[in-house]
Curated annotation (Swiss-Prot):
Subcellular location(s) per record: Cytoplasm
Family of this protein: Belongs to the class-III pyridoxal-phosphate-dependent aminotransferase family. OAT subfamily.
A Gene Ontology molecular function term of the record: pyridoxal phosphate binding
Protein's name in the database: Ornithine aminotransferase
Organism for this UniProt entry: Brevibacillus brevis (strain 47 / JCM 6285 / NBRC 100599)
Length: 399
């Protein structure tokens, strides 16, 4: 039995079956390329759901990890550590926000944001206790915790996990009139993904984010942008909200903030919002740990120094252009910004992902019928052309 089959069998035997991965084992990775135990080489076009914007094992990020691991890895927040302040200052500069609150995973950052906007509603907006409402969108994906699952509109994420947390309203994504109608004096925030990733790379109609910002401002409602998957250059801008020159009241960040090396997430907002927390009101033993902070600083430096945001914009435009050349009636729509692209089919997408895997290209279906392409932003034009050739080979139909 091959090493790959041994690992898959072992994983399936002892692990809970909460994922349905493609049948490949990755044992080595560098840049945009990964290898299986048998030495076969694959181009990664998923980037761990956009956590690998800087590529696998970027040498500067790995060096930052090694250097910090030789000094101190964890202090808890019972003490200061010498990496946290620099991380705060750099992320504050990137977001333009006055305060940062660090966590580890994206879902933790979302939970942090929910707690922050609720307490802001009570302490600042003076909403009656336990009456705060938060508006979210259909098709949302903000994580897997019970509270976040409570406002999911996907039955597969909710089945068997009730009772659910109250206090949320769901409106159609991109519907400004629905947002206006959903707001009441008790509304604390409107939280959304500026581009919905898990829903299939869904982009709201142009102007929606700007209109939403204006509606929120007029009603003293916080606009919260979940940039966990879209942030740090993925869409060809630092944040997807930048496409409409919208600066939300709060950013939620994760994934690529850790450079594909270490889990670190954060919420960024101004003091009026994050000052609602006092010692003991929220925390995380590992949040803001020196190892994660050192890695995140290096990850942000790599994005800036290597011009990866602009690279995403340029390579993404080229990629979209080439995908639109594919002649096949099963292609329903191609959507995307930067290197965040969804190719929606009229049939199941997984068989095509499996065919691409056999040709050495790794991608994954989302919402059954959409193939998500999100390669590391460091991808070269040569490697992108290599990928395009294989995508055309699998999807192209000659007349």
């Amino acid at each position: 039995m091959s090493k790959t089959n041994v690992v898959i069998e072992q994983t399936e035997k002892f692990g809970a079956h909460n994922y349905h991965p493609l049948p490949i084992v990755i044992s080595k990775a560098e840049g945009v390329w990964v290898h299986d135990p048998e030495g076969n080489k694959y181009l990664d076009m998923l980037s761990a759901y956009s956590a690998l914007n800087q590529g696998h094992r970027h040498p500067r990020i790995i060096q930052a990890l090694k250097d910090q691991a030789d000094k101190v890895t964890l202090t808890s927040r019972a003490f200061y550590n010498d990496q946290l302040g620099e991380f705060y200052e750099k992320l504050s500069a990137v977001t333009g926000k006055e305060m940062i609150l660090p966590m580890n995973t994206g879902a933790e950052a979302v939970e942090t944001a929910l707690k922050a906007v609720r307490r802001w509603a009570y302490d600042v907006k003076k909403v009656p206790e336990n009456q705060a409402e938060i508006i979210v969108c259909e098709g949302n994906f903000h994580g897997r915790t019970v509270t976040v699952t409570s406002f999911s509109s996907a039955e597969e994420y909710r089945r068997g996990f009730g009772p659910f947390t109250p206090g949320f309203k769901i409106i159609p994504y991109g519907d400004i009139e629905a947002l206006k109608q959903a707001i009441t004096p008790n509304t604390a925030a409107f939280m959304l993904e500026p581009i919905q990733g898990e829903a299939g790379i869904i982009i709201p109609q142009e102007g929606f984010l700007k209109q939403a910002q204006e509606v929120c401002k007029a009603n003293n409602v916080l606009l919260v942008s979940d940039e966990i998957q879209t942030g740090f250059g993925r869409t060809g801008k630092m944040f997807a909200s930048d496409w409409e020159n919208v600066v939300p009241d709060m950013y939620i960040m994760g994934k690529a903030l850790g450079g594909g090396v270490f889990p670190i997430s954060a919420v960024a907002a101004d003091k009026e919002i994050l000052s609602v927390f006092e010692p003991g009101s929220h925390g995380s033993t590992f949040g803001g740990n020196p190892l994660g902070c050192a890695v995140a600083v290096a990850a942000m430096d790599v994005l800036a120094d290597e011009g990866l945001v602009q690279r995403s914009l340029e390579m993404g435009a080229y990629f979209m252009e080439k995908l639109k050349e594919i002649n096949n009636p099963i292609i329903k729509e191609i959507r995307g910004r930067g290197l965040f692209i969804g190719l929606e089919l009229t049939t199941a997408a997984r068989p095509y992902c499996e065919k691409l895997k056999e040709l050495g290209l790794l991608c994954k279906e989302t919402h059954e019928t959409t193939i998500r392409f999100a390669p590391p932003l460091v991808i070269s034009k040569e490697d992108l052309d290599w990928a395009i050739d294989r995508i055309k080979q699998v999807l192209h139909v000659t007349e």
